[in-house]
Amino acid sequence: MKIKAISIDIDGTITYPNRMIHEKALEAIRRAESLGIPIMLVTGNTVQFAEAASILIGTSGPVVAEDGGAISYKKKRIFLASMDEEWILWNEIRKRFPNARTSYTMPDRRAGLVIMRETINVETVREIINELNLNLVAVDSGFAIHVKKPWINKGSGIEKASEFLGIKPKEVAHVGDGENDLDAFKVVGYKVAVAQAPKILKENADYVTKKEYGEGGAEAIYHILEKFGYL
């Protein structure tokens, strides 16, 4: 199937390790856009962050934020979940681990809880979820722990974003570097993992870049453009 759009993670995929945007990734994104291939930014960050990043980087596709819980396109926002059990979990975590911290972005979030991974282990979070019998999942993005409803993920976000573009998810190629990109891999037509990605993501990829971080993201975009006849 012909690839008509590229969805791509932000942190670690089009950035340096310190999260600064990588100029080579920026050039690759703009090259794809110039060829008529819309880029969809897909991130665990807030919808406000994703919208701003899209404007500054120069992408034309929808943005998928909050790990799939929020979609924004042409000044229209859709939230696919709300938080209830997440706060029950957080109250319990705070009782047991007083030093645990959520992201400073929590006041802007509506679809999931984000816990700083240096303050608690993701396996511990999962154990507490099971103890409390909550209908939640915890995913380590490599930058933070994202806690959300089971149906909220990058894959479901890409499915919804594809509707805005009038294409099928299988007509999207996805590029990522984290565990939370696995759900995206399940719905798209072509999958690329950046070199520093965890083993499980690489095992499920159609292509693994030779370079890491933003250089790897740039390599991924050019690879997709060449493979599907745009270059």
Curated annotation (Swiss-Prot):
Question: Which residues are annotated as active site?
Answer: D9 (nucleophile), D11 (proton donor)
Q: Which UniProt keywords apply?
A: Carbohydrate metabolism, Hydrolase, Magnesium, Metal-binding
- Can you list the GO cellular component terms from the UniProt entry? cytosol
SUPFAM superfamilies from the entry?
HAD-like
Enzyme Commission number(s) of this protein: 3.1.3.18
What CDD domains does this protein's entry cite?
HAD_Pase
UniProt binding sites for substrate = K154
Look up the domain of life of the source.
Archaea
Q: Which reaction does it catalyse?
A: 2-phosphoglycolate + H2O = glycolate + phosphate
Obligatory cofactor(s): Mg(2+)
Disulfide bridge map: none
Q: Which GO terms describe its molecular function?
A: magnesium ion binding; phosphoglycolate phosphatase activity
Q: Where does Mg(2+) bind?
A: D9, D11, D177, D181
Which InterPro entries does this chain map to?
HAD-like_sf, HAD_sf, PGPase
Q: What does the UniProt record say this protein does? A: Catalyzes the dephosphorylation of 2-phosphoglycolate. Has phosphatase activity towards p-nitrophenylphosphate (in vitro).
Which NCBIfam families does the protein's record reference? Pglycolate_arch, PRK01158.1, SPP-subfamily
Assembly and interaction partners:
Homodimer.
Alphabetical list of PANTHER family matching this protein: HAD SUPERFAMILY HYDROLASE-LIKE, TYPE 3 (PTHR10000:SF8), PHOSPHOSERINE PHOSPHATASE (PTHR10000)
Entry similarity comment: Belongs to the archaeal SPP-like hydrolase family.
UniProt name for this protein:
Phosphoglycolate phosphatase
Please give the organism: Pyrococcus horikoshii (strain ATCC 700860 / DSM 12428 / JCM 9974 / NBRC 100139 / OT-3)
